[in-house]
Amino acid sequence: MMENYKHTTVLLDEAVNGLNIRPDGIYIDGTFGRGGHSRLILSQLGEEGRLLAIDRDPQAIAVAKTIDDPRFSIIHGPFSALGEYVAERDLIGKIDGILLDLGVSSPQLDDAERGFSFMRDGPLDMRMDPTRGQSAAEWLQTAEEADIAWVLKTYGEEHFAKRIARAIVERNREQPMTRTKELAEVVAAATPVKDKFKHPATRTFQAVRIWVNSELEEIEQALKSSLNVLAPGGRLSIISFHSLEDRIVKRFMRENSRGPQVPAGLPMTEEQLKKLGGRQLRALGKLMPGEEEVAENPRARSSVLRIAERTNA
């Protein structure tokens, strides 16, 4: 079933070019998906190069296992644990580049059975890995109204979070929701002001998906681990699709591109300053898709690619 889904990788060349591939380098594709980035990386590696791919989606793992290449290996798990995967392989400080393509993929959105989309009726699941954790339906049936409202406001930036949360809880008391169409209808009915350019359930589905998959915590942990695993000169190439993701990436790169913040006038010797360490990253800027790519793939419209390089500090 999954092979029927056409998937166009957003900012494909730009993200891989951002890694500045060395033929003998060791790279991580933290979000294998359907393998667009991984295949391009492999095409640029020599015989000594290595690529470690990660994904927590079983369908992505099935696709990855079709790649017969001794330079390639796949791990079924969250990219937040990349530090552990690298340590297990004795590669700490030896990784030449990490690529992350954040958020939900087109095949996940387009497969109604995964429950990510309000446009297609399916089980109200939304898990990146359907074998682990609570589904969206299970969480919405057991969560407090205040907690649902907080999630919708925090992760969906939903203006009517309290009203929608109340409607969800009331509906689940009457009859537990198990389908995406049911949730979309409840949200639409509870939304007093409609945006003619956006479905009223858009923010709610984004928020619940982010919460169910701990997406923002996953990003923060992966970024933190990247500083430890990257070799000097190693690159970070990260694509985000909404402001919450991009804010985390931007802040991380900005904070680690600065040297130690020492209060003005505080007496410190040169030796003490050295112990504080220097900046750990050099931000190399951001890229956004061009008009042609957006025309071919409208989902690319909101994407942002940020690139940074590990320093010697």
Curated annotation (Swiss-Prot):
GO terms for cellular component: cytoplasm. One of its GO terms (molecular function) is rRNA (cytosine-N4-)-methyltransferase activity. Keywords: Cytoplasm, Methyltransferase, rRNA processing, S-adenosyl-L-methionine, Transferase. It is found in: Cytoplasm. The keyword Transferase applies. It is an enzyme of class 2 (transferase). Its EC number is 2.1.1.199. Its main location: cytoplasm. The keyword rRNA processing applies. Gene3D superfamilies: Putative methyltransferase TM0872, insert domain, Vaccinia Virus protein VP39. SUPFAM superfamilies: Putative methyltransferase TM0872, insert domain, S-adenosyl-L-methionine-dependent methyltransferases. It catalyses: cytidine(1402) in 16S rRNA + S-adenosyl-L-methionine = N(4)-methylcytidine(1402) in 16S rRNA + S-adenosyl-L-homocysteine + H(+). GO terms for biological process: rRNA base methylation. S-adenosyl-L-methionine binds at residues 35-37, 55, 79, 101, 108. NCBIfam families: 16S rRNA (cytosine(1402)-N(4))-methyltransferase RsmH. Belongs to the methyltransferase superfamily. RsmH family. Specifically methylates the N4 position of cytidine in position 1402 (C1402) of 16S rRNA. This is Ribosomal RNA small subunit methyltransferase H. It comes from Shigella flexneri. The gene is rsmH.
